[in-house]
A protein has these predicted regions:
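Mixed-charge, low-complexity intrinsically disordered regions
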Residues: 1-82
Length: 82
């Protein structure tokens, strides 16, 4: 394996996050795509998913980006401190 092809693992706290739409999720792990070497966030919904998937993956860059809500930039996901 050639490690020079991999980008460093992002420094991201695991645990509870709130999505900008209001639902809560538990970030379980960061995973690296086998082909692109892009980092992904593996997270699980902390609400009744009503038959929808409970565990999700999203590119790290998308998970940590800001979104524009009524002219205000807000984090897509915000770390929650208990």
């Amino acid at each position: 394996m050639r490690t020079e092809e991999f980008t460093p693992k992002p420094n991201m706290a695991l645990g509870k996050y709130r999505h900008y739409k209001g639902n809560f999720y538990d970030v379980l792990e960061l995973a690296c795509h086998t082909e692109t070497h892009e980092w992904y966030v593996v997270y699980k919904s902390l609400y009744d998913s009503k038959g929808n998937p409970e565990t999700w993956v999203r590119p790290y860059t998308t998970f940590t980006e800001t979104v524009n809500i009524k002219g205000t930039a807000v984090p897509r996901f915000q770390k929650v401190t208990d």
